[in-house]
From Swiss-Prot:
<keyword id="KW-0805">Transcription regulation</keyword>
<dbReference type="GO" id="GO:0005525">
    <property type="term" value="F:GTP binding"/>
</dbReference>
<keyword id="KW-0238">DNA-binding</keyword>
<dbReference type="GO" id="GO:0003677">
    <property type="term" value="F:DNA binding"/>
</dbReference>
<dbReference type="InterPro" id="IPR036388">
    <property type="entry name" value="WH-like_DNA-bd_sf"/>
</dbReference>
<comment type="similarity">
    <text>Belongs to the CodY family.</text>
</comment>
<dbReference type="GO" id="GO:0005737">
    <property type="term" value="C:cytoplasm"/>
</dbReference>
<feature type="region of interest" description="GAF domain">
    <location>
        <begin position="1"/>
        <end position="155"/>
    </location>
</feature>
<dbReference type="GO" id="GO:0045892">
    <property type="term" value="P:negative regulation of DNA-templated transcription"/>
</dbReference>
<dbReference type="GO" id="GO:0003700">
    <property type="term" value="F:DNA-binding transcription factor activity"/>
</dbReference>
<dbReference type="InterPro" id="IPR036390">
    <property type="entry name" value="WH_DNA-bd_sf"/>
</dbReference>
<keyword id="KW-0678">Repressor</keyword>
<dbReference type="InterPro" id="IPR013198">
    <property type="entry name" value="GTP_trans_reg_CodY_C"/>
</dbReference>
<dbReference type="InterPro" id="IPR010312">
    <property type="entry name" value="Transc_reg_CodY_N"/>
</dbReference>
<keyword id="KW-0804">Transcription</keyword>
<protein>
    <recommendedName>
        <fullName>Global transcriptional regulator CodY</fullName>
    </recommendedName>
</protein>
<dbReference type="Pfam" id="PF06018">
    <property type="entry name" value="CodY"/>
</dbReference>
Length: 259
């Protein structure tokens, strides 16, 4: 492939990702294909978002890292010291992508570190490694362009997460605001009783202890269930099984209690 063809292939990653869930594995595959190197996309916290290996590394520790999809904290933190692309780092470098315990097997191994930056912040790191042949200027151009594309997708994913979180919080707030004072009081007692995200509730016992009618509890649960905040299932004489579906519910409920 020519440099132009390789650039177009990376550009296609961005076009194909539009409106879809980000697939960092496919991105890593593309970068491995055009740069001809092992590719690891690592988040700022060391999570392995995606990887592709042109030459699999036969090392138990490396295999475990790939299986667990997590890079060591010390190594991840050290990557923040790399503020710009660092190319052709030898096995003796602290940033090498090759296992140091087997350095004698990879004496000619080379690593390139590309910081992934977006929105003025460090989002992660693109790590490339290969045996013997140096990373050329063309390789580095492709790597930095690839890092930019990956950064844009990380930002897009973060924006979607923030949007989803805001939507979940809004649903919870609307559901809680629909409750009457007595229904809200009932809900607070119910989840004090459950002491978690799910559990068995006997409405009559809570009604008697708190001094409210059973119908208040039933109405409160129905409102939350219709809003998609909880799921409830009657178990007959045993009571009602309740499970929280929206993670923001307990947080907002705790805020209300503290206020």
């Amino acid at each position: 492939m020519t440099l132009l063809e390789k650039t177009r292939k990376i550009n296609a990653m961005l076009q194909n990702a539009a409106g879809k869930t980000v697939n960092f594995k496919e991105m890593a595959d593309t970068l491995t294909d055009v740069i001809e190197a092992n590719t690891y996309i690592v988040s700022r916290k060391g999570k392995l978002l995606g990887y592709s290996e042109a030459l699999p590394i036969e090392n138990d520790r490396m295999k475990q890292m790939l299986t667990e999809r997590q890079f060591p904290e010390e190594y991840t933190q050290s990557l923040f010291n790399v503020g710009e692309t660092s190319s052709n780092l030898e096995v003796s470098s602290q940033y090498t992508a090759f296992p140091i315990e087997n350095s004698d097997l990879f004496t000619k191994g080379l690593t390139t570190i590309v910081p992934i930056v977006g929105g003025g912040e460090r989002l992660g790191t693109l790590i490339l490694s290969r045996l013997e042949s140096n990373f050329t200027d063309d390789d580095l151009l492709l790597a930095e362009y690839g890092g930019t594309v990956v950064g844009m997708e990380i930002l897009h994913e973060k924006a979607e997460e923030i949007e989803e979180e805001a939507r979940s919080r809004a649903v919870v707030q609307m559901a809680i605001s629909s409750l009457s004072y007595s229904e809200l009081e009932a809900i607070e007692h119910i989840f004090d009783e459950l002491n978690g995200k799910e559990g068995l509730l006997v409405a009559s016992k809570i009604a008697d202890r708190v001094g409210i009618t059973r119908s208040v509890i039933v109405n409160a649960l129905r409102k939350l269930e219709s809003a998609g905040v909880i799921d409830s299932r009657s178990l007959g004489m045993k009571g009602t099984f309740i499970r929280v579906l929206n993670d923001k519910f307990l947080v907002e409920l705790e805020k209300l209690k503290n206020n």
